[in-house]
């Protein structure tokens, strides 16, 4: 019984290690990412976050993922490049069609890319006599998300798929187009609300809906 528990614990640690490695370039765990530094500048920040609270990684992996899904997480590698006037996110999705993929952008400036590669039904599954000598290809679901910078033009996001490579592009806003923080006036103690501004009604911002990007 003790050996079974030890094996289960080792398997869980291995899965967490795989997910940590696969999300090293993933903005899901970072307050902001993609600001013109080195391509792997997020790795030290991720390490600090993991050291502070190593179980926060579980907040960003959907429940219900199995071993195949963890393998797909390591396959869906992401590159993020910033040019003079645009951002470009490139994801490796070998063997997947556009119908298998979903690209969304949420109101809180989070770009979410997900997909599923399904196993093909074989004659063995249909009751035939197929025999597998080797099975190394990865199947399952993946789920990546990136927090976009303030200069991202959310209305310009477009996605395309070519030879197993998904590319998501969006323009950069000019400095004078970037919305800064909203200044809220403070009422005086005497009740004068001349400078007081509303901060929104009940439930404001609670029902954010993701915008789907067509491939």
From Swiss-Prot:
Alphabetical list of InterPro entries matching this protein: A-crystallin/Hsp20_dom (IPR002068), CS_dom (IPR007052), HSP20-like_chaperone (IPR008978), Small_HSP (IPR031107)
One GO BP annotation of this record: protein complex oligomerization
Induction profile: By heat shock.
Major location category of this protein: endoplasmic reticulum
Keywords, alphabetical: Endoplasmic reticulum, Signal, Stress response
Segments of skewed composition (Polar residues): 205-215
Keyword Signal found: yes
PANTHER family named in the record: HEAT-SHOCK PROTEIN 20 FAMILY MEMBER (PTHR11527)
Quaternary state and interactors: May form oligomeric structures.
Protein name: 23.2 kDa heat shock protein
């Amino acid at each position: 019984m003790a050996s079974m528990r030890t094996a289960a614990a080792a398997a869980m640690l291995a899965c967490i290690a795989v997910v940590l490695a696969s999300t090293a370039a993933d903005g899901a765990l970072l307050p902001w990412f993609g600001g013109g530094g080195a391509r792997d500048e997020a790795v030290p920040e991720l390490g600090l976050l993991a050291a502070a609270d190593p179980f926060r990684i579980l907040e960003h992996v959907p429940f219900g993922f199995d071993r195949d899904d963890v393998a797909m997480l390591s396959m869906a590698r992401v590159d993020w490049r910033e040019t003079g006037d645009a951002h470009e996110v490139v994801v490796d999705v070998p063997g997947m069609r556009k119908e298998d993929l979903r690209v969304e952008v949420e109101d809180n400036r989070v770009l979410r890319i997900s997909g599923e590669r399904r196993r093909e039904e074989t004659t063995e599954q249909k009751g035939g006599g197929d025999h597998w000598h080797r099975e190394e290809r990865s199947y399952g679901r993946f789920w990546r998300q990136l927090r976009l910078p303030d200069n991202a033009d959310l209305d310009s996001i477009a996605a395309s798929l070519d030879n197993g490579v998904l590319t998501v592009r969006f323009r950069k806003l000019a400095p004078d187009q970037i919305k800064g923080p909203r200044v809220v006036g403070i009422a005086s103690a005497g009740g004068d609300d001349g400078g007081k501004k509303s901060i929104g009604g009940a439930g404001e911002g609670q029902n954010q809906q993701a915008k789907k990007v067509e491939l």
